[in-house]
């Protein structure tokens, strides 16, 4: 039986999820997007789906009616309901599963509104706290069961970090580590200098003109994906003046002494559609549109030895929009059919 999907929030991730599901074709035969909820008009949603400043023009016929998005002749009903519990898509469209992409329903308690409205399952496209499973596909998707109803797909950085940390820990054991994500700016930042609602002085500065230190919970969230690493990793972000394309640098102290060659060989061992390996000397624009959650870069591996102590640095690239979306869709396909 086909699982019917409603996308709540048709912003950067919601639209890219729709694109990815369409582009996968027969691979998504077990699911069907039937409705969208977003607080703007179908005409605006159609325009933003078709034309994307980062990922290019969507290669499908896209138009809109008064109450629908139309892609390749198929209608997708559009709602503009601000309260999740009031979206009538279960009754009207048979929605079974909500892909929650608004950035607002980012907890078990908040996303419960979708279940109260009749949906059976919810996948949140953001970190969502300690009381929900956080799933990074290729690392811990096997922890999902048919009894799970609300699950988090984590963040783009967690999806970049987890495969690399998992490989290091399984092969060599991680004692402690710190992560830095060199991260593209996002829609929550300022185009020009201006007051920040949270009174964060750095967030008040122009995103495309500055390197801006920023917090991230991605490293701490690794404990939700890999419990054996809980409390062992922390980190921060540097938001940089690029619109997309990021990298994660992880510096660790390991249980075993290693060489750079041994570390790279270990990463190669864990290569998968979710965790790629590329020895070319790439830069950030080269990873735009990549479908892996991250690409390990062996050219940047460093092992620094001082006596009997070592620091090990490993690096993975990721498209902070599309890599995460592809990972989320992998989780969606797995979760929806349990």
UniProtKB/Swiss-Prot annotation:
GO biological process, one term: glycolytic process
SUBUNIT field: Homotetramer.
Site residues, Activates thiol group during catalysis: 183
Taxonomic superkingdom: Bacteria
Pathway as given in its UniProt record: Carbohydrate degradation; glycolysis; pyruvate from D-glyceraldehyde 3-phosphate: step 1/5
Gene3D superfamilies linked: Dihydrodipicolinate Reductase, domain 2, NAD(P)-binding Rossmann-like Domain
Gene giving rise to this polypeptide: gap
MF terms in GO: glyceraldehyde-3-phosphate dehydrogenase (NAD+) (phosphorylating) activity; NAD binding; NADP binding
Claim: Coiled coil is one of the keywords in the record: no
Protein name as it appears in the record: Glyceraldehyde-3-phosphate dehydrogenase
Functional summary from the UniProt entry: Catalyzes the oxidative phosphorylation of glyceraldehyde 3-phosphate (G3P) to 1,3-bisphosphoglycerate (BPG) using the cofactor NAD. The first reaction step involves the formation of a hemiacetal intermediate between G3P and a cysteine residue, and this hemiacetal intermediate is then oxidized to a thioester, with concomitant reduction of NAD to NADH. The reduced NADH is then exchanged with the second NAD, and the thioester is attacked by a nucleophilic inorganic phosphate to produce BPG.
Disulfide cysteine pairs (residue numbers): none
Keywords: Cytoplasm, Glycolysis, NAD, Nucleotide-binding, Oxidoreductase
